[in-house]
């Protein structure tokens, strides 16, 4: 069902447009002054009224990212490529997605320590998650999609790694504007990596999730037997 491909595309477009909208509002109401220095994403979203929009964007992106992580995990498992690497990807994807919500709801001007924790979860663990996806794609059986997915994922992941390193080095040496630009590039690459999942999600025919298992008590003479039935 090609409609599943719209999910990662929607996340990429929604997140990109949403963050630049926050930037535009911050510039228009003078919350940030781009003539002095280029602002970090978190700085743009730290002041009202755009802080409310920033928090909601991060929350929605968190939910969409969690959804994508689960579907991707199940897709790889259903293709018979279940492995510890896939499980590690699921765990990292979950934690990094929660980090998106944390950094959006705990602004740096209020609780900076929690905000930085969320940023570390989102950036570092998110980068690790996408590297895992790149290697899973690389070791997958050859296909028409993999011919371009492998190089695209490795290029984007390499660029993200470079941006993370440059961002911390530039910030620690006082080049805040350059570090902020690296952060924006990093986040845009993350959205691009999410969007790339559309190439694989378009092959999904059906997605099913079992939400409850109910025990049925069956009486047989004096013995009691419990059976398990999936309730979907």
UniProtKB/Swiss-Prot annotation:
Biological process (GO) annotations held by this record are: autophagy
Membrane topology per record: Multi-pass membrane protein
The record's subcellular location field reads:
Cell membrane; Endosome membrane; Cytoplasmic vesicle, Autophagosome membrane
Which key words tag this protein in UniProt? Autophagy, Cell membrane, Cytoplasmic vesicle, Endosome, Glycoprotein, Membrane, Transmembrane, Transmembrane helix
* Residue ranges crossing the lipid bilayer per the database entry: 7-27, 51-71, 84-104, 116-136, 154-174, 178-198
Top-rank lineage group of the source organism: Eukaryota
Q: Which residues does UniProt assign to the signal peptide?
A: none
Biological role stated in the UniProt entry: Modulator of macroautophagy that causes accumulation of autophagosomes under basal conditions and enhances autophagic flux. Represses cell death and promotes long-term clonogenic survival of cells grown in the absence of glucose in a macroautophagy-independent manner. May have some role in extracellular matrix engulfment or growth factor receptor recycling, both of which can modulate cell survival.
User: What family, per the record?
Assistant: Belongs to the DRAM/TMEM150 family.
This chain belongs to the protein called Modulator of macroautophagy TMEM150B
Give the originating organism: Danio rerio (Zebrafish)
